[in-house]
Amino acid sequence: MNKLILLLSWFIISTSVSAQNETNLKGLETLAKQGDLSAQIELANAYRKGIGVTQDYKTAVKWFTLAAEQGNSDAQYNLGIMHSFGLGVVPNYQPAVKWYTLAAEQGDPLAQYNLGRLYYLGKGVPENLVYAHMWAKHASSNGFEMDAELAELLKELMTENQINEANRLEKEYEIKRYKTCFVNLLNE
């Protein structure tokens, strides 16, 4: 008898939770369609991970794209990953480079790392040790420790002129980022 009560309780609770998830999902979709960035990100992640919905990479790409077009670096990074690995899209490094670049320019260390790797490997962009090193250094300075090792390995493959050029580009990039941050603060 206790097992039957426990089973019925579990069924009632799971049905209630399922109905609540469906209601929450519909509410999120409504907000996302209205351009709500947080809802778009939450829906994209739900579809990417299969949380509360059936995993659907194509739908995740749709919602990440809408959020990325609003300038969200997390969505841009995720689109880079999805294009790199062919999740919901045909694998293609060129759009991956586009999305990684947009996120990397906003200071996303994982996007900077992946962008540096693509420049090193020449995938989606011409092989370029200078840019690979520059992005590896940025990722490292933004807390991604693996890129410090990559930057050092790249230095061994580079000429002194290439290292100097990478350092110059890195400084230019940092100045540009600081100026952008300052302008954004003034506009708030």
Segments predicted by a language model, with ranges:
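Sec-dependent N-terminal signal peptides
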Residues: 4-15
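N-terminal segments that cap or nucleate solenoid repeat domains
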Residues: 19-51
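Short helix-capping/linker turns of helical repeat alpha-solenoids
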Residues: 33-36, 49-51, 56, 64, ...
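Hydrophobic face of amphipathic alpha-helices that form TPR/SEL1-like repeat modules
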Residues: 42-49, 78-85, 89, 114-121, ...
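TPR/TPR-like alpha-solenoid repeats
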Residues: 46, 67, 82, 103, ...
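Terminal, low-structured helical/coil segments at or just beyond the last alpha-helical repeat
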Residues: 145-188
